[in-house]
């Protein structure tokens, strides 16, 4: 099948590995950070580290926006659901993110909060239309890939005149996250030679947002 078999071509993979081996300097260590949790999963699943030269190391990065969601944001969402009595909705993986004191949105639901799982931002907007007597809050999360969908429902809610729909915005921008990693604890102190950026995000934002990062931290 087109574009499937090519990704599973052992000969092609070995050729790429050999090309990498020819490029690296034997006496120098290399550290590359994959930014996305999907990359980390693929590297582990397919044993890609075994194909790389011994002096090339992959460093696991921040992962997905859900993985790095600050505890304070989860606490805020739980407080809205438990104390303010709103309909708090978000994607399924957000409901399991741990908050302070061992809490989570899923546990808040078990305590009586109206927490609902949705598959899209549009589902959250539909809930607001179906329950005009309730305040519906959508916990929005994701990289630049999901931000447009959140923006669209905000525009749609305004066009419909909905007063009971709001968004708790927890979207994350990729380039600032990269800068945060590379600047900790001080600019240039992190032993990383390159970053493997998230593919879906890069399709959305293009290469220009990365240019400043590449120029500033180039070795």
Each PLM stretch: what is its role?
Residues 1-133, 147, 158-160, 166-168, ...:
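Metallocofactor- and cofactor-centric catalytic cores in central/energy metabolism, strongly enriched
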Residues 213-219:
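Conserved anion/nucleotide-ligand pocket segment
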């Amino acid at each position: 099948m087109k574009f499937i078999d090519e990704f599973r071509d052992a000969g092609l993979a070995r050729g790429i590995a050999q090309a990498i081996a020819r490029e690296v300097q034997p006496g120098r260590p290399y550290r590359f950070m994959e930014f996305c949790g999907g990359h980390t999963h693929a590297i582990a699943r397919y044993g890609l580290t075994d194909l790389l030269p011994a002096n090339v190391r992959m460093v696991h990065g921040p992962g997905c926006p859900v993985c790095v969601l600050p505890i304070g944001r989860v606490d805020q969402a739980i407080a809205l659901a438990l104390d303010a009595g709103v309909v708090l909705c978000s994607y399924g993986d957000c409901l399991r993110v741990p908050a302070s004191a061992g809490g989570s949105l899923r546990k808040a639901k078990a305590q009586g909060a109206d927490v609902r799982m949705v598959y899209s931002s549009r589902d959250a907007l539909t809930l607001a239309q179906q329950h005009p007597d309730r305040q519906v809050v959508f916990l929005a999360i994701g990289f630049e890939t999901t931000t447009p969908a959140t923006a669209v429902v905000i525009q749609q809610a305004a066009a419909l005149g909905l007063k009971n729909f709001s968004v708790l915005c927890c979207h994350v921008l990729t380039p600032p996250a990269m800068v945060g990693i590379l600047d900790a604890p001080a600019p240039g102190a992190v032993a990383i030679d390159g970053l493997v950026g998230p593919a879906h995000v890069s399709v959305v934002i293009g290469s220009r947002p990365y240019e400043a990062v590449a120029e500033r931290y180039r070795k």
